[in-house]
C-alpha cells in the first residue's frame, strides 16, 4: 500500500489542474485514471477564455507549451442563430486588440488537450500518475481514505474526486446522479470541408425552434475540420422520443442556413454520444476530507454545455483548498465548506444566468420575440460581449426587468 496526502481520481482537466496546482506547493499526491492517454473524449472541442486565463494563472510557461504542442485555433466569439434565422455575432472581447488583450478562446480536440495536461503531470509526478488504473471502492478511515484500485491500495488523507458524473466505484461520500432536467444528451461528429466558417473562427450555436431548449453547433477546428453536434436536455429527449443523430442529419441535409455549407463536406467517422451533468449543483460538493471537481460536481454550463473551463477552475480551487487544509491541519466538514463557497462565488452567477436563459428556451414564441426585438438593437452585441468579461453585467442579466429595458431600447 502506498500513502499520500491527496489522491486525485480522474486525469481529465479538473484532476490534472488540481495535480499541477498541488505540485507548486509541494503537496504529495497520487493521481489515477482508468484510461490510457491519449484517449478519445466526446466533447464540442471549444475552450472558452476561462481556459487560457486559469492556465496562465497557474503557469504562463504551461500555456506557451500548450500553444506550441497542441496548436489550437484561436476563437474570437460566438455566432448565435435564433428562431426565425436571426443571426447575432458576439465577440468574446469587444474591439479585440491582440497586443493588449489575452487570447479570448480556443478550439482544439479534447484528445490533444487531455494528453497535454497528462504529460505535464507526468513530468512532475512520475510513477505517482497511474493510468489504466481502475478505482474499485473507497473506504473511510479515521485519518483519511483507503482507495482500492486495480493497481493496489492507496492510503490518502484527502480525496479530490474528478472522475466525472458516471463513475461506478462505491464512495463513502454523497455523489448524486444528475436528474433528467439537469442532464443534456449530446451527439457529435467531425466533418472536413464545411464552407462559410467565420473568418475569426467564431463558434456557431443554432437555437432552432424544433430542438429547443437544445441547440445544434458548428465549431471550427484546425486543419480544415469542424466539430458538428447537437445537444438537448435529457427529459425533453425522453418525452419527445428524439433520435439525436437523426435530427442532426436532418439539419445538415435540409436547414436552409446549414445544408449548402455541407454540400461538398465529408463526414469523418460515426457520430458519438455523451451526457453532460448541467451546472448549479444543489448538493454538497465537499465534506470531511473530500471534494468533487469538474463533471463530478455537475459544473457544466447549462446554456452552452461548456465544461472544460469550469473543470479547470474547480481543480485549481480544490487544490488551493487542500493546501489550506494542510497548512491549518483542518479537514473537518465545516472547514471544507469554503470550497463550495468559492466555487459559487467564481462560477455561480454565470451558471445562474445560463440556467435562467436555458429555462427560457422552453418557450419558442418568447425566444422568437426576443430575437426579433434584438435584431438591429445596437446595445445587444456589446452587452453580450460584456458577459464574458464583466461580472457586474452578469449580475444585471439576472434581472429580467434590465433585459426587458434593453430589448425595448430604454
Task: Tell me what each language-model feature is.
Residues 7, 23-43:
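Glycine-rich FAD pyrophosphate-binding loop
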Residues 120-261:
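Predominantly flavin-linked oxidoreductase catalytic cores and closely associated redox partners
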Residues 323-410:
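C-terminal helical "tail/cap" subdomain of flavin- and related membrane-associated enzymes
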Amino acid at each position: 500500500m502506498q500513502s499520500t496526502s491527496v489522491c486525485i481520481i480522474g486525469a481529465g482537466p479538473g484532476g490534472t489542474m488540481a495535480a499541477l496546482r498541488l505540485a507548486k506547493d509541494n503537496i504529495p499526491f497520487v493521481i489515477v485514471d482508468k484510461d490510457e492517454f491519449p484517449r478519445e473524449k466526446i466533447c464540442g472541442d471549444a475552450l472558452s477564455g476561462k481556459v487560457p486565463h486559469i492556465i496562465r494563472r497557474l503557469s504562463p510557461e504551461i500555456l506557451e507549451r500548450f500553444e506550441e504542442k497542441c496548436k489550437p485555433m484561436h476563437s474570437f466569439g460566438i455566432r448565435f442563430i435564433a428562431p426565425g434565422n436571426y443571426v447575432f455575432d458576439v465577440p468574446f472581447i469587444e474591439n479585440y486588440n491582440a497586443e493588449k488583450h489575452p487570447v479570448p478562446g480556443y478550439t482544439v480536440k479534447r484528445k490533444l488537450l487531455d494528453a497535454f495536461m497528462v504529460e505535464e503531470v507526468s513530468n512532475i509526478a512520475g510513477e505517482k500518475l497511474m493510468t489504466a488504473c481502475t478505482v474499485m471502492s473507497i473506504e473511510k478511515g479515521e485519518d483519511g481514505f483507503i482507495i482500492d484500485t486495480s493497481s493496489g491500495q492507496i492510503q490518502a488523507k484527502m480525496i479530490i474526486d474528478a472522475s466525472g458524473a458516471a463513475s461506478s466505484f462505491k464512495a463513502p461520500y454523497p455523489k448524486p446522479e444528475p436528474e433528467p432536467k439537469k442532464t443534456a444528451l449530446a451527439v457529435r461528429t467531425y466533418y472536413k470541408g464545411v464552407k462559410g466558417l467565420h473568418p475569426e473562427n467564431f463558434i456557431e450555436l443554432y437555437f432552432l425552434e424544433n430542438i429547443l431548449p437544445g441547440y445544434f453547433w458548428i465549431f471550427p477546428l484546425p486543419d480544415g475540420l469542424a466539430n458538428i453536434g447537437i445537444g438537448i436536455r435529457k427529459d425533453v429527449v425522453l418525452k419527445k422520443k428524439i433520435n439525436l443523430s437523426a435530427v442532426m442529419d436532418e439539419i445538415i441535409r435540409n436547414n436552409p442556413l446549414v445544408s449548402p455549407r455541407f454540400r461538398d463536406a465529408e463526414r469523418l467517422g460515426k457520430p458519438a454520444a455523451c451526457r453532460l451533468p448541467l451546472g448549479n449543483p444543489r448538493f454538497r460538493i465537499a465534506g470531511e476530507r473530500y471534494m468533487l471537481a469538474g463533471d463530478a460536481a455537475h459544473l457544466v454550463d447549462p446554456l452552452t454545455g461548456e465544461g472544460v473551463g469550469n473543470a479547470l477552475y474547480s481543480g485549481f480551487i480544490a487544490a488551493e483548498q487542500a493546501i489550506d487544509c494542510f497548512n491549518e491541519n483542518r479537514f473537518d466538514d465545516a472547514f471544507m465548506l469554503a470550497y463550495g463557497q468559492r466555487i459559487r462565488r467564481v462560477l455561480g452567477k454565470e451558471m445562474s444566468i445560463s440556467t435562467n436563459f436555458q429555462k427560457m428556451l422552453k418557450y419558442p414564441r418568447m425566444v422568437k420575440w426576443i430575437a426579433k426585438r434584438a435584431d438591429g438593437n445596437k446595445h445587444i452585441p456589446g452587452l453580450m460581449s460584456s458577459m464574458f468579461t464583466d461580472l457586474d453585467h452578469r449580475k444585471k442579466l439576472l434581472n429580467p426587468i434590465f433585459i426587458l429595458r434593453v430589448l425595448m431600447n430604454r
